[in-house]
Amino acid sequence: MGDDGSINRDPDALAGPVLFYNEVVIDHFMNPRNVGELDEGNTDGFGLVGDPSCGDQMKLWITVRAGRIAEIAFKSFGCPGAIATSSMLTALAESKTIEEARSITDDDVIEALGGIPEKKRHCSLLGVRALLAAIEDWERRRDGKEGRP
């Protein structure tokens, strides 16, 4: 993320590793889906996760209507793989029931992207972990438990 919270979609970020990413991954990096923030006052769940080994971080917001993810948005600070997998995760989770969204795995995200390099596999963990954290936050709020973890 840039200083203003925007995602760095500089094509030069792909200059070296572009040969390692397929067209779907590059598209989700250059044109991430559901990027940005949802209004905190109107969200039902929030997840914040990071990977200390590489410095990647992801924030994810959801709104839930009738047991389905009605809106989902993310902000990610990380490599092209982290941004692309976060984007794909939100595309997969949008409109799903909570249980369907909860069942999305790292492998589902990687498969939907057509694969990512093995050394970037850890990037796919952020989106799934952030989604699970947002769902847990929604459940706490729904059940009337105070505060976030």
Positions of the model-derived regions?
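Short Gly/Pro-enriched turn/cap motifs at secondary-structure boundaries
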Residues: L48-S53
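Short, thiol/selenol-centered motifs that function as redox-active sites or metal-ligating centers
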Residues: C54, S76-A84, C123
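Active-site cofactor/substrate anionic-group-binding motifs, chiefly glycine-
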Residues: W61, A73-F77, L92
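Alpha-helical support elements that line or immediately flank enzyme active sites
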Residues: G81-K96
